[in-house]
Amino acid sequence: MAAPSVMASSLAAFQARARHCLEASQQQVCEQALLEAEALQRRASARSAYPCQTLLLGVQADLVMQQLQAGRGAQAVADLQVATRGCAGL
């Protein structure tokens, strides 16, 4: 189970960290964003917010790809914005 600070992560804080990962490729930031994405997608699942969960799974894939230096650049950032809108209120 994730640390309480990860579980309490707000969607806005996650978005900022994930965007930083996607734009700057800093491994530590990417790892934290990935942990936050996991916590958020589990929260979405627990609330039966399956469209949001699906969007977050896509963001997780983008974060992993970024860690592997195979990121999708601007498309990944655009998908993060879509996920943030699709998960409003999570």
Language-model features, listed with the residues they occupy:
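Immediate post-signal-peptide N-terminus of mature secreted/exported proteins
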Residues: 2-35, 39
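Surface-exposed polar/charged interaction patches
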Residues: 21-24, 40-47, 90
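Short cysteine/histidine-rich zinc-coordinating motifs and their immediately flanking basic loops
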Residues: 33-34, 41-43, 64-65
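Residue-level detector of intrinsically disordered, flexible termini
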Residues: 1-2, 75
